[in-house]
């Protein structure tokens, strides 16, 4: 397959769609290290969760773990879905090729050492993102933090829907409605897979999830636009829809 993916154009969709080619900065690590058990000297996943915990003043570490996972899921879905809708190809985001700076922010946090285009169908997008990253990420988080599989699945669905919605909005602004429609159609197909089925309801570009990421528990936090709650629940309801 020829090199079809224009990373500069992809990044113009929005910050979550940004991907740079190269070895990354001095703080970047391959995602294979992120999913591995924490070594004695370096722990990129724990560092990121701790950074989110401090930044949000999260009341417990599982809230920070949820928000950190949601952010990574949004980055990965956006890059893959955007590439597939724009170019009919998706970059190989193999955990040995994709590097991440746990102290960075978009667009400077993701680097791909070698851009290798793969077919841009939903099956490949799922394999690249869900099988290649979200499942090992969820396993690593659940091994270390008290966080439910259902909550993490809900975050994955929310992140996918958000990527499709942002891509669709960009496509409308740019007069490229075909790109937006391809993104929505692919998202709908991905939600039909057992891994995401039941995480929420996708209606065009609108989505309502069936679980909560727990962000509302942070000081000054509220419910997200796609949350299952209309307003932050009382403390007695904290576990009602968190997993």
Question: What are these model-derived regions, one by one?
Answer:
Residues 16-17, 31, 35, 47, ...:
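Phenylalanine-focused residue identity feature
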Residues 1-43:
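A eukaryotic "domain-start" boundary segment
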Residues 173, 177-243:
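Cys/His-clustered metal-coordination modules, chiefly Zn-binding fingers
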Residues 35-204:
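Hydrophobic, aromatic-lined core segments that form the binding pocket/scaffold
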